[in-house]
Every structure is written in structure tokens, then in C-alpha cells.
Amino acid sequence: MNILTTLREQLLTNNVIMPQEFERLEVRGSHAYKVYSIPKRKAGRRTIAHPSSKLKICQRHLNAILNPLLKVHDSSYAYVKGRSIKDNALVHSHSAYVLKMDFQNFFNSITPTILRQCLIQNDILLSVNELEKLEQLIFWNPSKKRNGKLILSVGSPISPLISNAIMYPFDKIINDICTKHGINYTRYADDITFSTNIKNTLNKLPEIVEQLIIQTYAGRIIINKRKTVFSSKKHNRHVTGITLTNDSKISIGRSRKRYISSLVFKYINKNLDIDEINHMKGMLAFAYNIEPIYIHRLSHKYKVNIVEKILRGSN
């Protein structure tokens, strides 16, 4: 399959984009981004590069074309149909010991060089000219200089697939190592989690992970050592924002429960605006997915079926 030819045919046949617009994006697509920032969950701000409407259409079609061609490892839980942060946490819920690690500036660390390596590993062979055009459709040029560095953007619809595909070699090797030593391994985007019931088994993993990352990506992707955390049943264990309980279950955690309860109380007393009500509905839906028994208890606390009504969208 010629990827660019297939993409062009899909877009032009359906009059989704004009020929000259597509040709322009093949040459300067990496410049067609709107850039803004949003606050991070704990501190600082995250830069989002959002593709133009035409480029986004191209990327969505390209995503559909590449998806069946690129291997994604079974240990990957983010951006995979039928999987969620809940599924990711459940893998580790029966383990006493947990190790969490994190890739630094993950999406923006992924470059055309890494993608080219990934395409070859998936038996996708393109000419230099085809590769350059494909890279213009996938990557973002923050500097907007003629030969500026291209990186994967947070905000592009094709970035999740590319990020999972380029991690396949790492995921496979590290998962094989873990399987031999009775360790569970999952990756949720840039968050990697290891767990086991065998004491001290996780101690050497950070060094193994760092060495493998260097070997596989030549230093382009690195570990954020400040976020490497060991935990056990003696301490609070969290995986992708979900609490692991000592009875091998998952929970939204005490602080979230108190927060959600306060939102419902304010809602009953008509002290929430529209945005806050929508936020509360999202939190309730999240809690129902992770820990439905909590929603049942919350309903009993407020006696009337106010919580069920909120979840159903009733006023």
C-alpha cells in the first residue's frame, strides 16, 4: 500500500480537501498549528499544539490508514479501543509491591528519526521524498524555521497511535523480562507501572529500563527520575490516578470521595453554576465506573435518588 496515494485518494475523492491544499500540507503541514497552554494537574503548564482544521482531517484519515499497519503491544493501555485507566490499574490490583516510572516530555520527544525506525520495523518502506511528506503531515515544527526540529504534538489526533507504535520494541522486551520474573508490566502513554508480590524483585528495574530506553531510542526518549516511585501495601498505592486498596480492589480514594460529596451537597443547595454542574457529573460518572459501590453509598447518604438523577442527566 502506498500510504500517501491512499490518503490523497480518500481526501480528494470525497472532496474533503482541495488538491492544492493537500500539496501545501505535504510541504508545510508542520507549520499549521495553533499553540496554547493549559495548566498541568499539579504544577506548571502544558503546551498544546492543535492542528488546523484541514491538517486535522488529514491526520484522522492517516490514522485510519496506519492503524492496521502499525503494531501496538498488549501491555499498552492508553488510546487502545476497549481499554481504560481502570483496566490498567486492575492489572496491578492484586500485587503488594508497585514501581511507577514516567517518560519526560514524552510526545515532544518523539521525532521523525524514531518514526522512520518504527516504519521499517513494521515493514513499511517509503522513499525519502515520501517520508518527508509524511513527516510534514504528522509532526509539528515549534520554531517554524525552514529546517526546524520536528516533534510529535500534544493535541494531534494521530499522536496517540504514533506514540504507541514507536514504543512497541521497548514494550515487548521489557514485558518479556517482567514475565520471566513474575512481574506485571503496563504502559499508559508516558506512565509505566510494574507490580509483583515478590519482595525486592522491582529494585533493579529502573536501571534496566533506563539502559533499554537508551539502547532503543538513542537518548531521544528519557526517564523523568523525579517521578520514579516505589510503594507497597504499607503506603498508599496509586496507578494512573486510581487507588489500589489492600483488599486487592480499586478505589477513587478518600480525597475524591470527600470532594464529590461536597459537590453533590452544593448542587442540592443550588450553589453550583452550569460549568460546576457539568464537572460534578463527570466526577460522578468517573466514580461510578471505578467504584460503583461508592455511588450507592452516596445515594443512601442523601436519601433521595438525587445522585441517580444526576447520572441520568435529569434536573
From Swiss-Prot:
The keyword Magnesium applies. Keywords: Antiviral defense, Magnesium, Metal-binding, Nucleotidyltransferase, RNA-binding, RNA-directed DNA polymerase, Transferase. It holds the Pfam family RVT_1. GO terms for biological process: defense response to virus. Residues 19-244 form the Reverse transcriptase domain. SUPFAM superfamilies: DNA/RNA polymerases. GO terms for molecular function: metal ion binding; RNA binding; RNA-directed DNA polymerase activity. It comes from the Bacteria. Reverse transcriptase (RT) component of antiviral defense system retron Vc95, composed of a non-coding RNA (ncRNA), this reverse transcriptase (RT), a probable ATPase and a putative HNH endonuclease. Expression of retron Vc95 confers protection against bacteriophages T2, T4 and T6. At multiplicity of infection (MOI) of 0.02 cultures slow growth when infected with T4 but do not collapse, at MOI 2 cultures enter growth stasis. Responsible for synthesis of msDNA (a branched molecule with RNA linked by a 2',5'-phosphodiester bond to ssDNA). Belongs to the bacterial reverse transcriptase family. This is Retron Vc95 reverse transcriptase. It comes from Vibrio cholerae serotype O1 biovar El Tor. The gene is ret.
